[in-house]
Amino acid sequence: MNYLFKNGRYMNEEGKIVATDLLVQDGKIAKVAENITADNAEVIDVNGKLIAPGLVDVHVHLREPGGEHKETIETGTLAAAKGGFTTICAMPNTRPVPDCREHMEDLQNRIKEKAHVNVLPYGAITVRQAGSEMTDFETLKELGAFAFTDDGVGVQDASMMLAAMKRAAKLNMAVVAHCEENTLINKGCVHEGKFSEKHGLNGIPSVCESVHIARDILLAEAADCHYHVCHVSTKGSVRVIRDAKRAGIKVTAEVTPHHLVLCEDDIPSADPNFKMNPPLRGKEDHAALIEGLLDGTIDMIATDHAPHTAEEKAQGIERAPFGITGFETAFPLLYTNLVKKGIITLEQLIQFLTEKPADTFGLEAGRLKEGRTADITIIDLEQEEEIDPTTFLSKGKNTPFVGWKCQGWPVMTIVGGKIAWQKESALV
């Protein structure tokens, strides 16, 4: 099916929002211009809505295989499509871990069979993410590994991390890191700050993250490796990354929507839906994340979509697992709380969710260019809705944003020229 989207707006190559039509033919973007006509295409009048590149998320958890009670590739990618994401990068904390040929081939077969959007799987740095034996990077790359990470487990052994970075550099691949120094975690469940003190909870200090990033940056410099930092959350981490970039070290970084919108002062009670890792930090940390995003220290926004069951989250803040679901709320949360409040522009938000992650990792995604694969999301910037987890397509309903009123909701997502998801009656 060919589609002609009429009367839309998009961000052009100069970074300006302008009026446009867009023609999709044979799965590709055939033309982006005003006043397009086509005889062999279904015409869809988007009536002034935003035509954006499909969103790109380099940090997601799909849970399959091994955690299908939390999420599946099918439900997770449907939720991604509903959130406007067309390319997502799946973390390897599955069971089994994609750490060898057999496990990666199985994962890729599942993705091919079940995914509604483009899914790029990470390969693990170490076997079973155990930190003691390096995986076969060459084989994992051959089988389509996006990059290498041990995800929710920081690689504690510096010699292992250095060896991994050297091998990744030879393959022109990135090493991606969840940064925690295990000896400083302190069995914490929230940030070490006012909230932990008030509620008598063990806290995770900010330096637990930043000291690990500092170590890895020096290792990356020694290995001449592209090193990407997951979900930056502290002022100290931003400072260390900024200094590294000024020194010419190949470091990039991401921040989550929840760390841009919330800080520890916003946690109303010991509610496990506010428990994520890294935890919500202090006001100064929150301000540093915004500053880092605006000055280029932080390169992109990634959701860290981490679904859990209601039963798991009901165990209380100390025992419940870390993480919140993120696909279906990311764009409206950011548009409402950053763009509408004048903190960043719409153009910047689009870049942080599309071309910045795509360019950082060399993906042919993130831009509406003629000849490229038609990965597109249509967004209604005017429609206001309340966040209601009962409407989520994700199995995970674990969100701290219940009842938040937001604008900027995706209404249609196109992947490879085919409609992957459409809001009922939105464009008829």
UniProtKB/Swiss-Prot annotation:
Keywords from the UniProt entry: Hydrolase, Metal-binding, Pyrimidine biosynthesis, Zinc
Cofactor: Zn(2+)
Swiss-Prot/TrEMBL catalytic activity: (S)-dihydroorotate + H2O = N-carbamoyl-L-aspartate + H(+)
Functional pathway: Pyrimidine metabolism; UMP biosynthesis via de novo pathway; (S)-dihydroorotate from bicarbonate: step 3/3
Annotated GO CC locations: cytoplasm
Residue numbers annotated as active site: D304
Pfam families named in the record: Amidohydro_1
Residues that hold Zn(2+) 1 according to the record: H59, H61, D151, D304
InterPro entries, per the entry: Amidohydro-rel, DHOase, DHOase/Allantoinase_Hydrolase, Dihydroorotase_CS, Metal-dep_hydrolase_composite, Metal_Hydrolase
GO molecular function, one term: allantoinase activity
GO BP terms, alphabetized: 'de novo' UMP biosynthetic process; purine nucleobase catabolic process
The keyword RNA-binding belongs to this UniProt entry's keyword annotation: no
Superkingdom in the source lineage: Bacteria
Binding residues for substrate: H61, L62, R63, N93, N277, H308, F322, G323
UniProt enzyme class: hydrolase
EC number: 3.5.2.3
NCBIfam families: PRK09357.1-2 (NF006837), pyrC_multi (TIGR00857)
Stated family: Belongs to the metallo-dependent hydrolases superfamily. DHOase family. Class I DHOase subfamily.
Function: Catalyzes the reversible cyclization of carbamoyl aspartate to dihydroorotate.
The protein, known as: Dihydroorotase
Name of the coding gene: pyrC
